[in-house]
């Protein structure tokens, strides 16, 4: 009995010792200490990106001292902590960005006055900062730390709160930080910081709701456009191309084609409108290629809809010209639509299964198209052969 108890005790001790290093690597407010520097009475385990903020505030001179800690999204990446004096997002914020020099391994801090996402170059902040430095946190999973003192603007000091933004990214190339992910945690990493620390139980407010709403709108935008430009338009084109070859399908194929394309257009316009709305709400975030293709798609698809009103009769002399125009614009919409769906997927960066599923759907439609193309040509050639072998009437 005693030996059995001893074996159980030793086994428990073994597993406890084995797991203890992993537990110690999980950083939090209570586990972080700083040697040789001042103490920070307030600390927040921020809700996203495994970030931690230690801070103190001297109301007599409106000085905010901070230590921001977070692991970069990839080894060799960067971290950033910022105050936005006017808004709640990254655009317009005054940022401190830390990264390690790849050749020396020394961590340093760069300041960025982020006017827009397309212009991320080192620049002076709109308020004073000093005692700025960066370091790699020992035994903290590759996390970086930013130390700084900030002169809080008078209007923010009077309110007792500042809008803080934090972020992590994959790397630095030629002195420029590489774009961070646009997934949920990266969009939710904003909030309000109580300078006095009197409300530690609610460290962040207003960030998650705004981020979740934006993600929801992006998802709606993506679904609408994938269904319209990326699915219904190709199916509508296939109906017109391959059903009309069967004489019994006339004029049913025409009404099916029009119904499918009109539905695709209506859904596509809704998706285009949500894209414009997202653009207006995301100051400084620009996806020029995706945006320009979207505008082009809306424009030529609208022309295609109006062209149906000017469709000449089959025996009209301009019907041939109209057919060339209609087919050319239609295939342009088809190609641009599929390209822009993939552009959108790369921006949304959803789970890999979504992109795989769309590729599978498009691949299936492509396979069906090849099969129907062969069938169509066989039918056409047989009809021509039958006509050529018919005896001429006397």
From Swiss-Prot:
Residues 49-169 form the DOMON domain. Keywords: Electron transport, Heme, Iron, Membrane, Metal-binding, Signal, Transmembrane, Transmembrane helix, Transport. Heme b 1 binds at residues 221, 290. InterPro entries: AIR12_DOMON, Cyt_b561/ferric_Rdtase_TM, DOMON_domain, UCP037471. One of its GO terms (cellular component) is cytosol. Residues 184-381 form the Cytochrome b561 domain. Residues 1-24 form the signal peptide. It is found in: Membrane. GO terms for molecular function: metal ion binding. It is a multi-pass membrane protein. Pfam families: Cytochrom_B561, DUF568. The chain crosses the membrane at residues 220-240, 252-272, 292-312, 328-348, 361-381. Its main location: membrane. Binds 2 heme b groups non-covalently. Gene3D superfamilies: 1.20.120.1770. Its cofactor is heme b. Heme b 2 binds at residues 257, 326. DOMON domain could bind catecholamines and thereby could regulate the cytochrome b561 domain function. DOMON domain could bind one heme b. May act as a catecholamine-responsive trans-membrane electron transporter. This is Cytochrome b561 and DOMON domain-containing protein At4g12980.
